[in-house]
Curated annotation (Swiss-Prot):
Region feature (Disordered): 40-83, 467-490, 816-835, 883-904
Membrane topology, Virion surface segments: 23-771
Sequence motif Golgi targeting, location on chain: 849-852
Protein name, as recorded: Envelope glycoprotein B
Species assigned in the record: Human herpesvirus 2 (strain 333)
Biological processes annotated in GO: symbiont entry into host cell; virion attachment to host cell
Organism taxonomic ancestry: Viruses, Duplodnaviria, Heunggongvirae, Peploviricota, Herviviricetes
């Protein structure tokens, strides 16, 4: 189809050329391919209205989707020249209309020549702004304080007596507890001072009040004595303890009866105590609360501190020397001791004044590089070391407003002096005293401004010059008084998270970078505008229309009137009402051509047709005075609507879109510095240990102490079993104990003997319970019976024949001797082996005296038992018997003795 149109265009071009050669004033016909222009009459006028040029909006659409036009039949040779030219004009108009429809959004403007009614001038160069930066940058070192959430800790001593009353029922071989009553009683002040601390002993009784009645408990149900305190078996890392007894006292054993036993264990225990702000109470490590301030006392106005107890329950002792109950050593320095008795215990602790002992703020961070910058109505303290930014007011914060803040100034000065001596001593000097600011979030900043030595010398020189320039008699300006601090005090609350300061630091970091970048861009932009203003002033002389339109922001026409420009507003013309002609040659002047294409347009759709010339950038000029000599090889591209029209040899060739022409950018790339990387480090306001330790009660420590109490102050390994002899031994022991030292000595012997007997009996009993033991005992009993039988026979024999029983061998010899030799054969026998009657009589007399001696001894023994009178009576009786019973025998001769001696 495009080939057929091209042939038609060539035919039309040939005919137009022939007409032009016949009439010299007629312009040459262009070659129509793709886009065509309206034909021009031989006399230079338009032969017909050309079709509109396509708009640029549809150019890309046509490139994306190429729509083939309907196929037309090939043109047949025209019968004559006029018919061929008419057909070519119709084809050109149709093609131009199609182009106009595609580029309907292109706008044309008619700019009338300015008359000078409106004149404008260029603005003078502006003063470029400066970059927005922080003011009063100051370098220095800082100490950041936070709220002190740690409790006040101190050592305390508890004095109490554990009272245990047990009810036991005893069986024969077992015992059963019927009830156990346990209570805790406080130790009186006098006993604490005079007994425990002075001698290391404690009374065995406990006097305390229950149900508003005073009661007394006696240890072991006995009279009151002093018991020595001994160290506890188990000691913790943070405390020690002492007590008087390990074992619980059980009552004496009486079978089938209920008995009661009382145990009083005096305990002295060192514990940790803690108190939190406002220090109105404290709690012990055992979990016991004391509703009194640890700083309460009678010295230095401490009586105004809080207490919930009566005055007689509290006592303060000056010059108190504590004693170590383990080593019995006495402290070298005295203290002021507070004593408080409660219904359950007595507690003692060393009194100290409140003001220097506690502080509501504590040091958090020491920053050796802190930058202070003023932004608006606030200071911003930034540190790269901790990656945080703190925001404060411009006014300083008075330390007198901080409740219990005496440590702030002292700790701040010490830390600042230490950091300055370590890092800045040789290069900087301190400027004034430390300044204090309250930052958002409850952080108190102690800031010490620093100044380098070089700047300090410059400031000193400048100050000296100013002093030299002042008149000598000038009076110094009065110093401004510092604003008075608020008399009321407050406690600074610090947030537990520092994330807001980290975000503030990030925001300031980004803000500083962006503001720096935008500031540089603003300065560069301003300077560029000032530089371009010179170029605009020169360019307006060359093309005032373009300069004025670019400056005003809309299409205007302009011309120079000296140093000012006269401008007039351009009238827009719809693209459908503009027609471009196909020839740029001047028909009436051979060799002269138009430098820009000719156009015909209407202001309105039905308005009259106006002839003009296409200006720059779709401007429609009302005149056709843009001429130039015709040249060979002429090629031009002109903006027409949304695209370009191409003329070759001053004749229309074709139309193309702006996308078909390579674009050369006149913009300069802006090189912007990228934001540098910044790494955040973990930063905690309060550590896990500080948060755990911030509470008033440490439940772990309380549970540990409660479960360790029995292990420390009681013997859990000794077992007392049911024993029937325990009552007997207890009675004997009590009996001998009441007899004094001698009784106790005798009691030890007796108890040993009784213990041996009981042990022997117990051994026999256990031996009998064994089968082999029972058999052995049976054999022993049988042997004993046999021995008793023989002994009984011997006694009977002794009664019947004593001599035979006593002298069995002698009587046996007498029986076996010759019977004739005894008293036979007259006198010889009498003289020889017969019985001597005198000797028999003597033997009887001896037996009688032996019986008499036995009777006298028995009588005297009985008289000794009866008394002195009986003894005298016995003596008299013996004397009488001796006088009555004189000897009735004559002395024996010594013949036998002499004979015996001769035989020897």
């Amino acid at each position: 189809m495009r080939g057929g149109g091209l042939i038609c265009a060539l035919v039309v071009g040939a005919l137009v050329a022939a007409v032009a050669s016949a009439a010299p004033a007629a312009p040459a016909a262009p070659r129509a391919s793709g886009g065509v222009a309206a034909t021009v009459a031989a006399n230079g006028g338009p032969a017909s209205r050309p079709p509109p040029v396509p708009s640029p909006a549809t150019t890309k659409a046509r490139k994306r989707k190429t729509k083939k036009p309907p196929k037309r039949p090939e043109a047949t040779p025209p019968p004559d020249a006029n018919a061929t030219v008419a057909a070519g004009h119709a084809t050109l108009r149709a093609h131009l209309r199609e182009i106009k429809v595609e580029n309907a959004d292109a706008q044309f403007y008619v700019c009338p020549p300015p008359t000078g009614a409106t004149v404008v001038q260029f603005e003078q160069p502006r003063r470029c702004p400066t970059r927005p930066e922080g003011q009063n940058y100051t370098e220095g070192i800082a100490v950041v304080f936070k709220e002190n959430i740690a409790p006040y800790k101190f050592k305390a001593t508890m004095y109490y007596k554990d009272v245990t009353v047990s009810q036991v029922w005893f069986g024969h071989r077992y015992s059963q507890f019927m009830g156990i009553f346990e209570d805790r009683a406080p130790v009186p002040f006098e006993e604490v001072i005079d007994k425990i601390n002075a001698k290391g002993v404690c009374r065995s009784t406990a006097k305390y009040v229950r149900n508003n009645m005073e009661t007394t408990a006696f240890h072991r149900d006995d009279h009151e004595t002093d018991m020595e305190l001994k160290p506890a078996k188990v000691a913790t890392r943070t405390s020690r303890g002492w007590h008087t007894t390990d074992l619980k006292y059980n009552p004496s054993r009486v079978e089938a009866f209920h008995r009661y036993g009382t145990t009083v264990n005096c305990i002295v225990e060192e514990v940790d105590a803690r108190s939190v702000y406002p220090y109105d109470e404290f709690v012990l490590a055992t979990g016991d609360f004391v509703y009194m301030s640890p700083f309460y006392g009678y010295r230095e106005g401490s009586h105004t501190e809080h207490t919930s107890y009566a005055a007689d329950r509290f006592k303060q002792v000056d010059g108190f020397y504590a004693r170590d109950l383990t080593t019995k050593a006495r402290a070298t320095s005295p203290t002021t001791r507070n004593l408080l008795t409660t219904p359950k215990f007595t507690v003692a602790w060393d009194w100290v004044p409140k003001r220097p002992a506690v502080c509501t703020m504590t040091k958090w961070q020491e920053v050796d590089e802190m930058l202070r910058a003023e932004y608006g109505g606030s200071f911003r303290f930034s540190s790269d070391a901790i990656s945080t930014t703190f925001t404060t007011n411009l006014t300083q914060y008075s330390l007198s407003r901080v409740d219990l803040g005496d440590c702030i100034g002292r700790d701040a000065r010490e830390a600042i002096d230490r950091m300055f001596a370590r890092k800045y001593n040789a290069t900087h000097i301190k400027v004034g005293q430390p300044q204090y600011y309250l930052a958002t979030g409850g952080f108190l900043i102690a800031y010490q401004p620093l100044l380098s030595n070089t700047l300090a010398e410059l400031y000193v020189r400048e100050y000296m010059r100013e002093q030299d320039r002042k008149p000598r008699n000038a009076t110094p300006a009065p110093l401004r008084e510092a604003p008075s601090a608020n008399a009321s005090v407050e406690r600074i609350k610090t947030t537990s998270s520092i994330e807001f300061a980290r975000l503030q630091f990030t925001y300031n970091h980004i803000q500083r970078h962006v503001n720096d970048m935008l500031g540089r861009i603003a300065v560069a932009w301003c300077e560029l505008q000032n530089h371009e203003l010179t170029l605009w002033n020169e360019a307006r002389k060359l093309n005032p229309n373009a300069i004025a339109s670019a400056t005003v922001g809309r299409r205007v026409s302009a011309r120079m009137l000296g140093d000012v420009m006269a401008v007039s507003t351009c009238v827009p013309v719809a693209p459908d009402n503009v027609i471009v002609q196909n020839s740029m040659r001047v028909s009436s002047r051979p060799g002269t051509c138009y430098s820009r294409p000719l156009v015909s347009f209407r202001y309105e759709d039905q308005g009259p047709l106006i002839e003009g010339q296409l200006g720059e950038n779709n401007e429609l000029r009302l005149t056709r005075d843009a001429l130039e000599p015709c040249t060979v090889g002429h090629r031009r591209y002109f903006i027409f609507g949304g695209g370009y029209v191409y003329f070759e040899e001053y004749a229309y060739s074709h139309q193309l879109s702006r996308a078909d022409v390579t674009t050369v950018s006149t913009f300069i790339d802006l090189n912007i510095t990228m934001l540098e990387d910044h790494e955040f480090v973990p930063l905690e306001v309060y550590t896990r240990h500080e948060i755990k330790d911030s509470g008033l009660l440490d439940y772990t420590e309380v549970q540990r102490r409660n479960q360790l109490h029995d292990l420390r102050f009681a013997d859990i390994d000794t077992v007392i079993r049911a024993d029937a002899n325990a009552a007997m031994f207890a009675g004997l022991c009590a009996f001998f104990e009441g007899m004094g030292d001698l009784g106790r000595a005798v009691g030890k012997v007796v108890m040993g003997v009784v213990g041996g007997v009981v042990s022997a009996v117990s051994g026999v009993s256990s031996f009998m319970s064994n089968p082999f033991g029972a058999l052995a005992v049976g054999l022993l009993v049988l042997a004993g019976l046999v021995a008793a039988f023989f002994a009984f026979r011997y006694v009977l024999q002794l009664q019947r024949n004593p001599m035979k029983a006593l002298y069995p061998l002698t009587t046996k010899e007498l029986k076996t001797s010759d019977p004739g030799g005894v008293g036979g054969e007259g006198e010889e026998g009498a003289e020889g082996g017969g019985f001597d009657e005198a000797k028999l009589a003597e033997a009887r007399e001896m037996i009688r005296y032996m019986a008499l001696v036995s009777a006298m001894e028995r009588t005297e023994h009985k008289a000794r038992k009866k008394g002195t009178s009986a003894l005298l009576s016995s003596k008299v009786t013996n004397m009488v018997l001796r006088k009555r019973n004189k000897a009735r025998y004559s002395p024996l001769h010594n013949e036998d003795e002499a004979g015996d001696e001769d035989e020897l």
